A protein has these predicted regions:
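Class I S-adenosyl-L-methionine-dependent methyltransferase catalytic core
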Residues: 1-195
Length: 195
């Protein structure tokens, strides 16, 4: 346990797909002028340096975000791809690709005042990175060193009764697959209108 480090995999093809969907769901929730919560059960470090030893050792980002990064200025780029690339470009000041946002960073960039981001992470190194990354953020972010699977039922439904739950464990343990299903069932029982 705790051998998984997302820095090796940040920006890979699976991250790109997951984050395209996340940005689209967030954009949909933002259409209503009502606050909502984002709960990330396995937040990771929040932000990843693609020039780090982790990222360059695996090189996985090259087949993911590295492959579509040139499309940010291309005509005809699909809307979902463009929306994600715009978020990543804002983080990189529109220039070279160095920083890749994890789900917490993407959500933080998009949320409004009154919305809330709850981040759960159990990994001792990742929680430190997450806390460091969000150290200057005083509004609307809570970070908990807890098992996101067991924490989720305790915080549902969120106070505004609108929310998005993001569940993406490292699948380091075989029972993570079973725990995802159990968490989804528990979430559905506690908050039938959640996303």
């Amino acid at each position: 346990m705790f051998s998984y480090r997302h820095g090796f995999h940040a920006g890979n093809h699976a991250d790109v797909l997951k984050h395209m969907v996340l940005v689209q769901v967030l954009e949909h929730l933002l259409q209503k002028d009502k606050p909502f919560w984002v709960i990330d059960t396995h937040a990771g470090g929040g932000l990843y340096d693609l020039t780090s030893n982790y990222a360059t050792k695996s090189g996985e980002f090259e087949g993911g975000i590295g492959r579509i990064w040139p499309l940010r200025k291309a005509a005809g780029t699909p809307v979902a791809v463009k929306a994600l690339l715009d978020q990543i470009a804002a983080l990189n000041n529109g220039t070279d690709l160095r920083w890749y946002p994890g789900s917490p960073q993407l959500a933080a960039q998009m949320l409004r005042q009154g919305d809330h981001l709850r981040l759960c992470e159990l990994h001792p190194t990742e929680i430190g990175l997450l806390r460091d990354h969000f150290a200057g953020v005083k509004r609307g972010v809570s970070i908990e060193q807890v098992d996101g699977f067991t924490d989720l039922p305790k915080v549902l439904p969120p106070p505004p009764r609108r929310g998005l739950v993001h569940i993406d464990p490292p699948y380091e343990l075989k029972d993570d697959y079973k725990k995802v299903l159990q968490a989804l069932r528990a979430a559905r029982e506690r908050s039938a209108t959640g996303t």
